[in-house]
Amino acid sequence: MAKIVVTGGAALHGEVSISGAKNAVLPILCATLLADEPVEITNVPHLHDVVTTVKLLGELGAKVTIDQGTLSRGSAIVVDPRSVNQHVAPYELVKTMRASILVLGPLLARFGAAEVSLPGGCAIGSRPVDQHIKGLQALGAEIVVENGFIKATAKRLKGGHFTFDMVSVTGTENVLMGAVLAEGTTILDNCAMEPEVTDLAHCLIALGAKIEGLGTARLVIEGVERLSGGRHEVLPDRIETGTFLVAAAMTGGKVTVNRARPNTMDAVLSKLVEAGAKIETTDDTITLDMQGKRPKAVNLTTAPYPAFPTDMQAQFMALNCVADGVGVINETIFENRFMHVNELLRLGADIQVEGHTAIVRGNEHLSGAPVMATDLRASASLILAGLMASGETTIDRIYHLDRGYENIEEKLSSLGATIRRVP
């Protein structure tokens, strides 16, 4: 199984281009099932989860054509849904990726039936799917869960009013996709406001959907008879952006990220400024300068957008490990999201966990050691810590990393990091 080896000690300098957002491209690929003509998606990152989603679309009968593109521009994928002839998402694919559940709403809305295996993916807490089910039931779907499958039917979904019990990104996306072809008007309240949800809505609108309230907690959808073909460019990945900025801040470097979307990054950028970084932005670039400085520890609490994202928690924990002072991190979104702590301790970090809170005392010196990635963002935090550790840090189970970061070792190498992938 492949590993990544990081040799610490180098400050990062230079420029890096950000890939398309993992958490936007997966629902957008699923949304192509709603159309009755080919849909082109551009700025698609080379990620394992994208490969899995493309396989899933193929299993359902869609014809998928991929133009590999370049490292800086991403791929273009054309999905022709006219040949879809299956409505079952098999366990073999769904078990490896939770986002597979996002075919539930589109299949149900377009074809009147869907069977989706209960999802797998990251080992982070329970992540219940009840919000998906309740929301689609509010639009008239008949749904049963049996033998490990969600089985849904509907002649045609009907507009309705549904309030999510809790903020759910994929729940919002699934019910939104169901509503665009429903008969009449749907009002969804307590929706997730993440930029990736808004990007999905922009894609649906490009195909002919009628959606109002983008970026707010209330979405109003006027159902249409059909969605046509079209083209959509996936927005840049704000978590990848944040990861590279934290790497620059930790190592005392200066890095410019290109093809970014600074207006989706307020919570992360403000914490980096609090840590002592100087930050300059344009419409699509962010430059972070931490030259000659050690970061200051920061306190943070994860919460739904626009608050601090849970997907950046592990990276900021790595920053706090080498920062000046004590940082307190509260994780309010997912259970089991401190699985990286034991691995950071192996590098010499000083972390105490009490329930959903981690207290991190900064230590100027970490030491390289063999560590194991437990999930996607944890694997990124171990690379960041490795950049600051003396000697070599070897990170095992990096298949987690390939689910969400495109060519991370090449990109870090281009900034001066000593990092390589080994068999």
Swiss-Prot record:
Pathway: Cell wall biogenesis; peptidoglycan biosynthesis. The modification 2-(S-cysteinyl)pyruvic acid O-phosphothioketal is found at C122. GO terms for molecular function: UDP-N-acetylglucosamine 1-carboxyvinyltransferase activity. GO terms for biological process: cell division; cell wall organization; peptidoglycan biosynthetic process; regulation of cell shape; UDP-N-acetylgalactosamine biosynthetic process. It holds the Pfam family EPSP_synthase. InterPro entries: Enolpyruvate_Tfrase_dom, Enolpyruvate_Tfrase_sf, MurA_subfamily, RNA3'P_cycl/enolpyr_Trfase_a/b, UDP_GlcNAc_COvinyl_MurA. It catalyses: phosphoenolpyruvate + UDP-N-acetyl-alpha-D-glucosamine = UDP-N-acetyl-3-O-(1-carboxyvinyl)-alpha-D-glucosamine + phosphate. It comes from the Bacteria. Phosphoenolpyruvate binds at K22, N23. Keywords: Cell cycle, Cell division, Cell shape, Cell wall biogenesis/degradation, Cytoplasm, Peptidoglycan synthesis, Pyruvate, Transferase. The active site is at C122. It is found in: Cytoplasm. UDP-N-acetyl-alpha-D-glucosamine binds at R98, R127, P128, V129, D130, Q131, D311, I333. It is an enzyme of class 2 (transferase). Gene3D superfamilies: Enolpyruvate transferase domain (3.65.10.10). The keyword Cell division applies. Its EC number is 2.5.1.7. The keyword Cytoplasm applies. Cell wall formation. Adds enolpyruvyl to UDP-N-acetylglucosamine. PANTHER family: UDP-N-ACETYLGLUCOSAMINE 1-CARBOXYVINYLTRANSFERASE (PTHR43783:SF1). This is UDP-N-acetylglucosamine 1-carboxyvinyltransferase. The lineage of its organism: Bacteria, Pseudomonadati, Pseudomonadota, Gammaproteobacteria, Lysobacterales.
